[in-house]
Amino acid sequence: MAKESIRRRLAAILAADAVGYSRLMERDEKSTHTLLMARWKEVLEPLVGIHQGRVFKRTGDGVLVEFGSAVNAVECAAALQQAMAAANRDLPEDRAIVLRVGVNLGDIMVEDSDLFGDGVNVAARIEALADPGGVAISDGIHEYVHGRTDIDFVDSGYHEVKNIERPVHIWTWSPKDRAREPPNIAAEPPPQLPAKPSIAVLPFDNMSGDPEQGYFADGITEDIITDLSKVSGLFVIARNSSFAYKGKTPDIRKVSRELGVRYVLEGSVRRAANRIRINAQMIDGTTGGHLWAERYDRGLEDIFAVQDEVTRTIVNALRVKLTAGEEERRESRGKVDPEAYDLLVRSRQAILQFNALSSMEARRMLHRVLEIDPGMAAAHASLSIIALTDFINQWNGATPDNLTQALGLAQEAIDTDGSEPQGHYTLALALSWMRRLDEAEHAAERAIELDPNSANAYTALGTIRDFQGRHEEALALYTRAHRLDPQFDLSLHFQGRALLNLGRFDEAEVAFKRRLLLAPRSDMTRFYLACLYGRTGRHEEARGYWREVLGVNPSFSVDHLRRSLPYQDPHLMDRLVEGLREAGVSI
């Protein structure tokens, strides 16, 4: 290499490497590679951008990143490991991508866009000394960051490392060590058991012999959760939190403690041609004892009848008395066209992928469902959700006409079956975005009447009350939603917003920071944190979080928020952002 082309500078270097990557590749090469690339794109790259770093080399299962600031490098390393832990939460241990991360400060040589020298080499060696899921840093880095960050490192002594003459003094940190977590974001205490019978339905195992049929087992589970949720005498954990255990074999008593329920339903689904076999068993999570087990073997056209039987068995076993309205709604729903049901279930999975392409695919499937069975209210409601989601995210050429379309589809769902809660829920959402808050409030209240365990409906009503300026009521509704869906990070965001509006800044900060641990790419949560810090005089932190907002979403616009968020009193939005101005942020 030509001498004149080499420049030198001091830099902080972050080295990250996947633990046991060769073993993962041997097990499933395609899925492992796809997952790693997704983690780099969706987790690593946004965090590097937020912390003003630059990825300068990829090494198959690892990356090297340059930072101009030691503090930025260390905070990025910790945020990366916290985000990876959250991303791995729903994966079996033998499929999770776990990283080791090392950070070093040293002199580097620069040629074109690549970096060389001891500064880089030591970072790579230090990385190997980190615990899986943890961070190791050199003594030089520690001198710079000590007292400048909330992350507490443990002195791990001197280590001999390959090809480095002198022993290296390292310090280590792991998000698994609760004692080392930054203050204000400790884990939430486990929830208490409700007074009424409480249950969580874990994802049913797919026993069909075809992994591609996993969506069908998920659909059966979701339908059973939905049916149980409509029973006012039960407390039923929402789908998001139940599905946090998908692909795992958790201890039922641990699930019971984590979700705060007494009973847990688990089972399996086997589908062959147009036949279906469901095995289900209910367990007392406080003792681990089995209460009952049953097998259902039917034609696929009787799937609704099977789901009704499962629900009825649970209700009877727990001695829950149905109201007159619930008894009426429990009447047989008759047979279903197998193709229509299959498409309906697949469309739900597509919607959950939450991108423009999957939104288009879900819409196509739902239109086919309604061609087969125009009376399927859930399909109309799902189409309404898609129209709204496209509008909010500006997908698929969305325009304000999407709101009118969403409103019409929600009304069609209600006209088709007025007892279908999702129709009223989607009507509430559409009316909210159209700034018709009083009408939206009535629709959300009706959704809760029909589905008293719907975390989504409580969140919708809470959001409406928040926009109406009724923040105490909103907070109570968000808290109720979070109890029903304790693993869903967005409810923490909404709780934080209500607390911020109420001036309860310390509690709001805790909620927002807990949310960022679970959703590290959220621009909106960072925006509200920046507003909070501005209003409480912590102006440097406010400016820092505002920079992070733009790092995650360069097109973020406060003016767009003013136009889109339907606050009944526009001064509520002014009050939110005044702290940013006080911090010197140009908006």
UniProtKB/Swiss-Prot annotation:
Statement: the UniProt record of this protein carries the keyword Zinc: no
SUPFAM superfamilies reported in the protein's UniProt record: Nucleotide cyclase (SSF55073), TPR-like (SSF48452)
Catalytic reaction equation(s): ATP = 3',5'-cyclic AMP + diphosphate
One GO MF term attached to the UniProt entry: ATP binding
Residue ranges annotated for the Guanylate cyclase domain, each copy included: 12-127
GO biological process, one term: cAMP biosynthetic process
Ranges of the TPR repeats in the UniProt entry: 343-376, 421-454, 455-488, 490-522, 524-556
Keywords: ATP-binding, cAMP biosynthesis, Lyase, Nucleotide-binding, Plasmid, Repeat, TPR repeat
InterPro entries documented for this protein: A/G_cyclase, Nucleotide_cyclase, TPR-like_helical_dom_sf, TPR_rpt, Ycf3/AcsC/BcsC/TPR_MFPF
Record-stated family: Belongs to the adenylyl cyclase class-3 family.
Protein name as it appears in the record: Putative adenylate cyclase 3
